[in-house]
Amino acid sequence: MNIDLKYILNKTVELINIPSPVGYTHNAIEWVKNELKGLGIKNFNITKKGALIAYIKGKNSNYKKMISAHVDTLGAVVKKIKKNGRLEVTNVGGFAWGSVEGENVTIHTISAKTYSGTLLPIKASVHVYGDVAREMPRTEETMEIRIDEDVKTDEDVLKLGILQGDFVSFETHTRILNNGYIKSRYLDDKLCVAQILSYIKYLKDNKLKPKTDLYVYFSNYEEIGHGVSVFPEDLDEFIAVDIGLVAGEDAHGDEKKMQIIAKDSRSPYDFTL
């Protein structure tokens, strides 16, 4: 099988450039839908939950497999508009606040307007706060967004149309290096989405069918633990494709190989698979 790496790379970058924190994934799902249409896939539906499930007829209809990848990412939601015109946010998905300190962010309003800002500690300057700035724990309560607008009060912010509940996405810093490495946020799991699309493209380009009937599930709530929570009734086998942690303290994984996960924090996986 010849893998179209250029296609995978291009589609990965396209999808990474579409902000899709959990709960704000409609644009990413719409992109996937259009990509599938371009690949000749007509049999698909968008669930009430906002995920997309495609169906590809295979050589054997007596056995049905499903593969999945997720379009949702980590992000944040506006929790509070402060009196000083700054925003307190709550995390969406699990991440360390220190990993996004100083990050450029985009605030997505209900009216589809966007505003840029910076996520910083409430006491950011060492020149002003000394060791307090260095040693203060980075938590939801000690981090805030400074909006890139002339706002001094909560009323100023409200006039922009920014409200509690607005979604916040982080800058991705996507870089394609000459040696083949990719540096970016949200390779988990948008790279895997692109890989699945490349497999469908391979089938189309070579006029092939998968060995069995195939469901392809693009989920949108994986980062908070219920990405693929419902399966088609006739499903026999399910494989989730994800960017996992293979280089932990006690792991013997390899970042350049596929890993088959035996167990996560919730449950062991199926031995026969």
What are the language-model segments listed below?
Residues 1-273:
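N-terminal hydrophobic/helix-forming segments and targeting peptides
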